[in-house]
Amino acid sequence: ETGITMQNIIKSIKEKKGTLLDVRSKIEFEENHIAGAINIPLDMVEVNIKNIETMPKPIVVYCLSGGRSGIATDILQQNGIEDVYNGGGIFSLNNFINNN
């Protein structure tokens, strides 16, 4: 990435110019999620490529610890979707959003 920092990406998200994509299960999402996030569980990412393609960029993908979001980010990038970032785990990402 050319000078794109997580701060800039989060700024876009806060300005409602991007998308927070939660790839945890529906149950996990219903228990708690970052405000404004969209839930598409990891096993549904591939079948939702066309839908995800139309979401506002940047897209920040997160899960519980960063594992599933890493896989989802790879899937999206391999399908030609640009401006997609692995935001890691929900708690660290939420802290980052609240502190930036």
Describe these PLM feature segments.
Residues 2-19, 26-58, 67-100:
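Rhodanese-like catalytic fold shared by cysteine-dependent sulfurtransferases
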Residues 62:
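Short, surface-exposed ligand- or partner-binding patches at beta-edge/loop junctions that are enriched
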